[in-house]
Regions:
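Basic, Lys/Arg-enriched C-terminal extension of HTH/homeodomain DNA-binding domains
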Residues: 55-83
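Short, flexible helix-to-coil linker/hinge segments that flank and couple to helix-turn-helix
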Residues: 1-18, 25, 75-80
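Helix-turn-helix DNA-binding segment
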Residues: 10-49
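Short, hydrophobic secondary-structure boundary micro-motifs
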Residues: 4, 39-42, 82-83
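Residues within the DNA-recognition helix of helix-turn-helix
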Residues: 42, 53-56
């Protein structure tokens, strides 16, 4: 079971590595439960720009919902924990 989890975590990390820095910042804040409005304020960008980054991020990750993107982020963080 742990080998399978490690593989999934590595796959998630590889997918997240394809994101731009700004897309990763948006994903980090989504993972923290922030709304687009809060993300926009924190990053000093417009809510529309957050939507664009979020859409690009989800397309690159192959995520249909924000929850899938957050799950990938959490799985990617398991790599260090599983070693």
């Amino acid at each position: 079971m742990q080998a399978r989890q490690r593989r999934r975590a590595m796959e998630a990390r590889m997918r997240i590595a394809m994101l731009s820095n700004r897309e990763r910042e948006v994903l980090d804040r989504l993972t923290q439960g922030c709304s687009n409005k809060v993300i926009a304020r924190d990053l000093d960008i417009s809510p529309r720009t957050v939507e664009i980054h979020r859409g690009n991020m989800m397309e690159k990750l192959g995520a249909r919902h924000a929850a899938e993107a957050v799950r990938l982020q959490l799985e990617a963080s398991l790599v260090d924990w599983l070693h």
